[in-house]
Amino acid sequence: MSLTDYVREVSLADFGKPFKHQASWNRRLRTTGGRFFPKDGHLDFNPKILEEHGETVFRQIVRHELCHYHLYFEGLGFRHKDQAFKELLDQVDGLRYAPKLQSHQANYLYICQDCGQAYDRKRPINLAVFACGRCHGRLIEKNQS
């Protein structure tokens, strides 16, 4: 079964409405489970979510994106902050946030000396230039082991 067929099946089963556009995989997505494109109505999904978290979580993410999709084409509020979106997401048991991926590993850990805020980074940062985003305190590198 193709991804578009799967999304059509979920749309009919959980929303009672047809999905009339295309769904595709997007391997470039890192921290999000999927994306809705209002301009042409297509959906992109992160294949790593299905691989790492299974079909149950992936189906909830499909529901999340279909909430955006159906609300947009009905002319209702389709953004995360809109009440219509939040209510529909609760009704269909969709995920509000995508779960963290194990494949996204941080190599560097920086801690603010003043407030204790932690920052995980894949790439090193210049401690002479960058400061804490919360309190503007000095950052120190903590060894990851």
UniProtKB/Swiss-Prot annotation:
Alphabetically ordered keywords of this record: Cytoplasm, Metal-binding, Zinc
Cross-referenced SMART domains: SprT (SM00731)
GO BP terms: response to stress
UniProt-recorded Gene Ontology molecular function terms: zinc ion binding
Names of required cofactors: Zn(2+)
Catalytic-site annotation from UniProt: 65
Cofactor notes: Binds 1 zinc ion.
GO cellular component, one term: cytoplasm
Keyword Membrane in annotation: no
Binding of Zn(2+), residues: 64, 68
Pfam families given in the database record: SprT-like
SprT-like domain location: 5-140
Subcellular location: Cytoplasm
The keyword Metal-binding belongs to this UniProt entry's keyword annotation: yes
Family label: Belongs to the SprT family.
NCBIfam families: PRK04351.1 (NF003339)
Protein name as it appears in the record: Protein SprT-like
Phylogenetic classification of the source organism: Bacteria, Bacillati, Bacillota, Bacilli, Lactobacillales
